[in-house]
A protein has these predicted regions:
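Short, acidic, metal-binding catalytic loop of nucleotide-sugar glycosyltransferases
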Residues: 40-49
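A conserved acidic beta->alpha catalytic loop
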Residues: 56-63
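The conserved acidic donor/metal-binding loop of glycosyltransferases
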Residues: 101-106
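Hydrophobic helical membrane-anchoring modules
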Residues: 1-20, 33, 157, 181-240
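Cell-envelope/extracellular polymer assembly enzymes that use nucleotide-activated donors
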Residues: 21-23, 51
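Short aromatic/hydrophobic "clamp" motif used to bind/position activated sugar donors
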Residues: 97
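Active-site beta-to-alpha loop of glycosyltransferases that engages the nucleotide-sugar donor
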Residues: 26-40, 61
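Acceptor/aglycone-binding surface of glycosyltransferases and processive sugar-polymer synthases
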Residues: 76-90, 108-184, 210-221, 226-231
Length: 240
């Protein structure tokens, strides 16, 4: 009997992953206003069974709040989004790695759905924020994310709906077998490289909430860096 994401049994005759097999990871940087809510949501949805890892470069109370919620905190000098998240995905050793952001924009209540899809055989489950319109997202960011998805679709030859979502689930071999090179554009790289290397990737609609706290990403400089990463990674993978 296999078990679903809540630890129950199903009748397909094979053992599936449960939340005891899941690490929820994130890079954190001065998110004291929101990180406690995110970690409480993870704890509630997973019944405290998922491991949580925060790679943190904060100068505020974020790391203390994370530790108070039972998270493993890896301190790192601030070097950018991708450096922190790359460390976060490679630190734990559980067989399923889930990435999220620490600003309370992502629906932790959909973690069981993500784990169910991994148990169905998908290697990467990627949350699509734009499916429902992402009305909570600033208009400039929303249009930019649609443009990134179009660029990635053209360059990869595969329909991509949301390249920069922060909520994904990966089988551990995916994150360990690929060399990750990007910083600001890591979120796009984390989708494009597995997609073009033949891993089973699925995008699923997710709700998206208004962020708590102030964004640290400059929309213009950050957007240019992400577009550059999409082009670079797509071409590297197409011609490798």
């Amino acid at each position: 009997m296999s078990r679903n994401a809540d630890g129950d049994s199903s009748a397909d005759g094979s053992d599936g992953f449960t939340f005891d097999d899941v690490s929820v990871v994130m890079g954190t940087y001065n998110e004291a206003e929101a990180v406690g809510t995110v970690l409480s949501d993870v704890d509630e949805v997973t019944d405290g069974r998922a491991e949580v890892v925060c790679v943190d470069g904060s100068s505020d109370e974020t790391p203390g709040i994370a530790r108070d919620h039972g998270a493993t905190v890896v301190r790192q000098a601030p070097q950018g989004y991708g450096v922190a998240v790359r460390e976060a995905i490679l630190t734990p050793d559980r067989p399923v790695v889930v990435t999220t952001d620490c600003d309370d924009t992502y629906p932790m209540e959909q973690l069981p759905e993500f784990l169910d899809l991994v148990n169905e055989g998908y290697d990467v489950v990627s949350g699509d924020r734009l499916y429902h319109g992402a009305d909570a997202m600033p208009g400039l960011n929303r249009q930019g994310n649609r443009a990134f998805a179009l660029l990635a679709s053209v360059l990869t030859g595969r329909r991509v709906h949301d390249t920069t979502t922060g909520m994904r689930a990966y089988r551990r071999d995916v994150v360990e077998d690929i060399e990750w090179t990007e910083n600001t554009g890591l979120s796009a790289e984390l989708l494009i490289r597995p997609l073009l290397r033949g891993y089973d990737v699925i995008e699923v609609p997710i709700a998206y909430r208004e962020r708590r706290g102030r964004t640290k990403l400059d929309p213009f400089a950050g957007g240019a860096a992400i577009a550059k990463s999409i082009a670079k990674v797509s071409l590297e993978e197409r011609f490798r």
